[in-house]
Amino acid sequence: MTATPRMARYLEYSTQIYNIYLKYIAPEDIHVYSIDEVFLDVTQYLKTYGMTARELASRIATEILEKKGLTATAGIGTNLYLCKIAMDIVAKHMEPDDNGVRIAELDEISYRELLWDHRPLTDFWRVGGGYRKKLEAAGLYTMGDIARCSLGGEQDFYNEDFLYKM
């Protein structure tokens, strides 16, 4: 099956969804990553709305569904990396709620618990096939392996310098 690309329509939807974000978040707290992905820094809005990050994400996703007929996936984290990983690896692989929405949360502890042994490394943001091959050639197959490698001292084979030189 093939589909004709309709970029103008895609851009129109993207703009309309961005306008939904603006109902909740100021433009300086919306960081566009791509045409269909943004980072929202909602930290200062949670108290104002009296909501958790999950509740606010759910409200925004529900409005996107109601106004545009599109389901949304959200990743919530204590930093941008964890937000992205929560969305890319955890949320996209979980069962949706009744509205088709998927929301996953990660902090440093849950990242270790859920993803320390996750494979393949290419599922992680910014780890491409070439870098994966270099890491695996060095015996590093998981994020846990990489984290342990960074703990090595100057005299150890595995240490931070080893990673930087890859």
What would you call each of these model-derived segments?
Residues M1-M166:
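Gly/Gly-Pro- and Ser/Thr-rich, intrinsically disordered tail segments characteristic of DNA damage-repair
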